[in-house]
């Protein structure tokens, strides 16, 4: 009887909850839901003498995130008047604290999750008009997500927990009964909070609800008074009303793309499919933040899928106005490449068939080329952000740092499959070139993270940055396990940085704890070795 050929998926099925035993058991990083060539050479090797400072990047970035706040305290930001409609103390913190929390939201969260315009939001919450129920729900979401950043002595841990739970329940109850754009904005902001606390069922369910409502309301396609897509007519009856202004139109576009971003970080290292499939989306990329804030209609970049739901569906360029793109635009683009990498790594592969291996390598090189092209097309100085030095940064640069962390994650995700295959054959052997790419990407992120620490920017970065740190640290464990060598001492830096991020994002603390346990067990001599863990 002829034996069946050996088939395996580059990324194997696993329990989504990381354990000490599973953390280095495959070729690509894993989290609870878990987590050419010349283009990124500059991200792999020691920085040149003309390395840029964060200050120089900030000074050259006047067009990006012009209105984002980097205030450390809000005492001088408290307005003289009180809102026309007072807010019950049992539901929300006092008015001055609310103002502080909204200010903190635009400092710590909105720069990398830019779905709201600062001025329009403050006018809505703290203007002379009374606040409507839909806007109050959005305020609840901001409170729930931003309480972690408040140092006000009045907000004891018990009160924070109380306000958080009240706001969470208010949002969920309202969203179930009122499927509208404002409720979706509140859900997306709440998802930032939930996914920053743990990678578990609650976050996945929340993303599923958001993605379904995005499609139901027709927010996954261009359909407004400025741009319109006729490619994918909706069959639903829950169509959102026409946006009244460019800001409203762009807010909806950003709402869809931010759901896409959160879904990628929550899904990318699982065996699951994405909740929001970009192959069915027909959306322009979001524009620069300053254009958004100025209510200035512009065109950006619009790639339309030629065929839906194919594994690597080709796209056609409908619009291309790169001068109107910002950091969030490029973040969405690189996560689109990561989406294709994710699908590629989950395709079954017969490692005994040379023809299958050749086809696999061809796709692998194509995806590598996409990453190269993306990096080369970044605006001038931002392509060298891995060379940041110490200076006086503001929140305007934090989103560009997170953008490059996403690039590092994509590089590791792709190349670790060739560098550290879980199953080998005479035609599918580990690639030394891929190993160097992975280690170079890890070093690049370490340099960026060191600059972030030296300039006091860590609190400005969101939990996706913690995810990238976790991916890089786990790569060092996989390398030690595969090569049967000692663990790189750099892993201590990644663990320490994750512990510091854990002050605001619980998921970072969990990553640090798991890594610490694995390093201790593998280094103790009495437990399993790293190589034994991977087997």
What do the predicted segments below correspond to?
Residues 1-110, 209, 238, 310, ...:
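Intrinsic, low-complexity transcriptional activation domains
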Residues 330-333, 337-351, 476-479:
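Solvent-exposed, amphipathic alpha-helical segments
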């Amino acid at each position: 009887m002829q034996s069946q050929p050996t088939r395996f998926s580059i990324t194997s099925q696993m329990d989504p909850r990381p354990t000490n035993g599973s953390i280095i058991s495959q070729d690509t990083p894993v989290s609870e839901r878990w987590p050419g060539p010349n283009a990124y050479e500059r991200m792999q090797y020691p920085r040149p003498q003309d390395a840029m400072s964060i200050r120089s990047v900030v000074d050259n970035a006047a067009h990006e995130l012009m209105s984002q706040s980097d205030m450390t305290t809000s005492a001088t930001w408290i307005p003289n008047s009180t809102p026309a409609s007072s807010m019950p103390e049992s539901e929300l913190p006092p008015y001055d604290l609310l103002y502080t929390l909204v200010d903190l939201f635009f400092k710590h969260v909105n720069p990398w999750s830019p779905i709201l315009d600062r001025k329009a939001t403050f006018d809505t919450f703290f203007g002379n008009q009374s606040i409507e129920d839909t806007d109050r729900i959005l305020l609840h979401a901001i409170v729930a997500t931003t309480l972690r950043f408040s140092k006000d002595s009045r907000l004891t841990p018990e009160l924070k927990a109380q306000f958080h739970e009240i706001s969470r329940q208010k949002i969920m109850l309202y969203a179930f009964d009122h499927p509208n754009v404002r409720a979706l904005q509140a859900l997306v902001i709440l998802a930032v909070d939930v996914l920053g606390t743990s990678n578990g069922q609650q976050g996945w369910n929340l993303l599923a609800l958001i993605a379904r409502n995005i499609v139901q309301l027709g927010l996954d396609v261009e359909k407004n008074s400025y741009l319109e897509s006729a490619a994918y007519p909706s069959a639903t009856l829950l169509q959102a009303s026409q946006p009244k202004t460019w800001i409203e139109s762009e807010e909806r576009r950003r709402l869809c793309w931010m759901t896409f971003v959160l879904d990628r970080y929550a899904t990318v290292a699982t065996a699951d499919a994405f909740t929001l499939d970009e192959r069915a989306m027909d959306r322009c990329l979001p524009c620069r933040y300053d254009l958004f804030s100025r209510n200035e209609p512009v065109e950006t970049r619009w790639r339309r899928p030629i065929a839906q739901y194919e594994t690597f569906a080709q796209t056609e360029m409908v619009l291309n106005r790169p001068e109107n793109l910002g950091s969030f635009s490029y973040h969405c683009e690189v996560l689109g490449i990561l989406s294709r990498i994710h699908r590629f790594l989950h395709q079954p592969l017969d490692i005994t068939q040379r023809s299958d291996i050749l086809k696999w390598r061809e796709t692998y090189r194509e995806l590598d080329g996409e990453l190269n092209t993306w990096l080369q097309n970044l605006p001038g100085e931002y392509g060298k952000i891995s060379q940041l030095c110490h200076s006086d940064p503001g929140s305007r640069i934090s989103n560009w740092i997170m953008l490059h962390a996403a690039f590092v994650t994509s590089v590791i995700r792709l190349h670790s499959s060739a560098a550290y295959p879980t199953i080998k054959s005479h035609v599918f052997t580990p690639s030394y070139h891929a190993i160097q790419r992975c280690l170079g990407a890890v070093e690049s992120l370490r340099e960026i993270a060191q600059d972030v620490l030296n300039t006091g920017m860590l609190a400005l970065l969101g939990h996706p940055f913690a995810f990238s740190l976790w991916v890089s640290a786990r790569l060092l464990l996989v390398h030690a396990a595969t090569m049967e060598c000692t663990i790189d001492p750099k892993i201590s830096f990644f663990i320490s940085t994750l512990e510091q991020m854990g002050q605001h994002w619980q998921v970072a603390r969990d990553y640090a704890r798991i890594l610490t346990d694995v390093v201790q067990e593998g280094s103790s001599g009495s437990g399993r070795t790293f190589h034994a863990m991977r087997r």
